[in-house]
């Protein structure tokens, strides 16, 4: 079951099983200026590891994409750690493509590369 919090322009959804949250997706307007408008961004998506392959992640992402499609978004984007091969395979299986943008994000003394994925809706 998906619970929704569609306040303002940054809606989020929670996936539940048996009354317990097992994942979430948070979305909103794109933060990157080069994303064609109207567009949207998946800010975060997370599913508990024990729920991977349960369909929860797919349902969350599909719900978010449909929400923005209904609001005439043409492109959705998300950022993923370059080394996150499982996450990247998940997005690619759902039609997302690396769009050539990359950036470094800093966590204290560490710098981690991210790549951007896009989906035309």
What are these regions (language model features)?
Residues 1-50, 58-63, 67, 71, ...:
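Acetyl-CoA-dependent GNAT
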Residues 12-13, 38-40, 74-77, 81-88, ...:
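C-terminal "cap" of GNAT-fold acetyltransferases
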Residues 48-50, 54, 82-83:
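Active-site acidic-Proline motif in GNAT/NAT acetyltransferases
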């Amino acid at each position: 079951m998906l619970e929704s919090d569609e306040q303002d322009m940054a809606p989020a959804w929670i996936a539940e099983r048996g009354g317990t949250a097992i994942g979430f997706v948070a979305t909103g307007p794109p933060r990157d200026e080069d994303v064609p408008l109207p567009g949207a961004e998946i800010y975060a998506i997370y599913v508990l590891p024990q729920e991977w392959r349960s369909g929860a992640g797919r349902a969350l992402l599909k719900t978010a994409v449909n929400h923005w499609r209904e609001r005439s978004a043409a492109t959705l984007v998300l950022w993923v750690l370059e080394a996150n091969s499982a996450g990247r395979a998940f997005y690619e299986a759902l039609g997302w493509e690396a769009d050539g943008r990359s950036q470094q994000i800093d966590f204290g003394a560490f710098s981690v590369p991210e790549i951007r994925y896009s989906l035309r809706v």
